A protein has these predicted regions:
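A conserved acidic beta->alpha catalytic loop
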Residues: 38-47, 66
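Acidic helix N-cap motif at the loop->helix transition within catalytic regions
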Residues: 17-19, 43-52
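Short, acidic, metal-binding catalytic loop of nucleotide-sugar glycosyltransferases
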Residues: 23-32
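Acidic donor-diphosphate engagement hotspot in glycosyltransferases and nucleotidyltransferases
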Residues: 21, 45, 74, 82, ...
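Cell-envelope/extracellular polymer assembly enzymes that use nucleotide-activated donors
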Residues: 4-6, 33
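Short aromatic/hydrophobic "clamp" motif used to bind/position activated sugar donors
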Residues: 86
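Glycine-rich, basic loop-to-helix element that forms the pyrophosphate-binding segment
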Residues: 63-81
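Conserved donor NDP-sugar-binding/catalytic core segment of glycosyltransferases
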Residues: 94-118
Protein backbone atom coordinates (compact mmCIF):
# COMPACT_ATOMS: atom_id res chain seq x y z
CA UNK A 1 0.00 0.00 0.00
CA UNK A 2 1.26 3.47 -0.88
CA UNK A 3 1.78 6.07 1.85
CA UNK A 4 -1.19 8.34 2.40
CA UNK A 5 -1.33 11.96 1.26
CA UNK A 6 -2.77 14.91 3.18
CA UNK A 7 -4.05 17.79 1.06
CA UNK A 8 -3.77 21.13 2.84
CA UNK A 9 -5.72 24.10 1.50
CA UNK A 10 -5.45 27.65 2.81
CA UNK A 11 -8.53 29.65 1.93
CA UNK A 12 -9.51 33.27 2.10
CA UNK A 13 -12.65 34.40 0.30
CA UNK A 14 -12.35 31.27 -1.88
CA UNK A 15 -15.99 30.21 -2.15
CA UNK A 16 -16.02 30.70 -5.92
CA UNK A 17 -13.44 27.93 -6.50
CA UNK A 18 -13.31 25.85 -3.32
CA UNK A 19 -16.29 23.61 -4.05
CA UNK A 20 -14.79 22.30 -7.30
CA UNK A 21 -11.35 21.97 -5.71
CA UNK A 22 -12.73 19.84 -2.87
CA UNK A 23 -14.79 17.68 -5.22
CA UNK A 24 -11.67 16.85 -7.22
CA UNK A 25 -9.54 16.19 -4.14
CA UNK A 26 -12.19 13.85 -2.75
CA UNK A 27 -12.01 11.85 -6.00
CA UNK A 28 -8.20 11.81 -6.17
CA UNK A 29 -6.29 8.61 -5.47
CA UNK A 30 -4.60 8.06 -2.08
CA UNK A 31 -5.85 11.26 -0.43
CA UNK A 32 -6.27 10.30 3.24
CA UNK A 33 -6.87 13.75 4.71
CA UNK A 34 -8.15 17.07 3.40
CA UNK A 35 -7.55 20.04 5.67
CA UNK A 36 -9.03 23.43 4.85
CA UNK A 37 -7.57 26.24 6.94
CA UNK A 38 -9.59 29.41 6.49
CA UNK A 39 -8.28 32.90 7.22
CA UNK A 40 -11.55 34.53 8.33
CA UNK A 41 -13.55 34.37 5.09
CA UNK A 42 -16.98 35.97 4.91
CA UNK A 43 -18.06 34.68 1.48
CA UNK A 44 -19.67 31.33 2.32
CA UNK A 45 -16.48 29.28 2.48
CA UNK A 46 -17.51 27.73 5.81
CA UNK A 47 -20.78 26.40 4.40
CA UNK A 48 -19.00 24.82 1.44
CA UNK A 49 -16.48 23.04 3.66
CA UNK A 50 -19.18 21.92 6.11
CA UNK A 51 -21.10 20.33 3.24
CA UNK A 52 -18.02 18.42 2.11
CA UNK A 53 -17.09 17.44 5.68
CA UNK A 54 -20.55 16.01 6.30
CA UNK A 55 -20.21 13.87 3.16
CA UNK A 56 -16.57 12.83 3.62
CA UNK A 57 -14.80 12.26 6.96
CA UNK A 58 -11.43 13.07 5.38
CA UNK A 59 -12.42 16.74 5.15
CA UNK A 60 -11.72 18.86 8.23
CA UNK A 61 -12.08 22.63 8.65
CA UNK A 62 -9.85 24.88 10.75
CA UNK A 63 -11.36 28.37 11.11
CA UNK A 64 -9.12 31.25 12.09
CA UNK A 65 -10.76 34.24 13.80
CA UNK A 66 -8.43 36.51 11.83
CA UNK A 67 -5.96 36.24 8.96
CA UNK A 68 -2.60 35.04 10.35
CA UNK A 69 -1.20 34.69 6.83
CA UNK A 70 -0.55 31.96 4.31
CA UNK A 71 2.47 30.35 5.99
CA UNK A 72 0.89 30.25 9.44
CA UNK A 73 -2.26 28.69 8.00
CA UNK A 74 -0.24 26.04 6.16
CA UNK A 75 1.53 25.22 9.42
CA UNK A 76 -1.87 24.78 11.12
CA UNK A 77 -2.88 22.32 8.41
CA UNK A 78 0.35 20.37 8.83
CA UNK A 79 -0.13 20.22 12.61
CA UNK A 80 -3.61 18.74 12.09
CA UNK A 81 -2.42 16.08 9.63
CA UNK A 82 -1.10 12.58 10.24
CA UNK A 83 -0.28 11.50 6.68
CA UNK A 84 3.41 11.10 5.79
CA UNK A 85 3.00 13.02 2.50
CA UNK A 86 1.75 16.60 2.33
CA UNK A 87 0.34 18.40 -0.70
CA UNK A 88 -0.17 22.15 -0.40
CA UNK A 89 -3.11 23.00 -2.65
CA UNK A 90 -4.39 26.43 -3.63
CA UNK A 91 -8.21 26.59 -3.55
CA UNK A 92 -8.37 27.36 -7.27
CA UNK A 93 -6.30 24.30 -8.24
CA UNK A 94 -8.19 21.47 -9.90
CA UNK A 95 -6.07 18.34 -9.40
CA UNK A 96 -6.45 15.35 -11.64
CA UNK A 97 -7.43 12.01 -10.12
CA UNK A 98 -3.88 10.64 -10.38
CA UNK A 99 -1.75 13.80 -10.12
CA UNK A 100 -0.78 13.73 -6.44
CA UNK A 101 -0.32 9.96 -6.29
CA UNK A 102 1.95 10.10 -9.35
CA UNK A 103 4.01 12.91 -7.82
CA UNK A 104 4.43 10.87 -4.65
CA UNK A 105 5.45 7.77 -6.64
CA UNK A 106 8.01 9.79 -8.58
CA UNK A 107 9.42 11.26 -5.37
CA UNK A 108 9.70 7.79 -3.84
CA UNK A 109 11.63 6.56 -6.88
CA UNK A 110 14.11 9.46 -6.69
CA UNK A 111 14.91 9.45 -3.00
CA UNK A 112 15.13 12.72 -1.07
CA UNK A 113 13.79 15.48 -3.29
CA UNK A 114 11.15 18.14 -3.72
CA UNK A 115 8.72 18.03 -6.64
CA UNK A 116 6.24 20.46 -8.10
CA UNK A 117 3.84 20.65 -10.99
CA UNK A 118 4.29 23.23 -13.70
Amino acid sequence: MSPAIAAIIVSYQSASTLDACLLRLREARDIAEIRVVDNDSTDGTLEIVQRHASADARVRFIANPDNPGFAAANNQGVADSQAPWLAFINPDLMVGPETLALLRERALSLGDCVLGVE
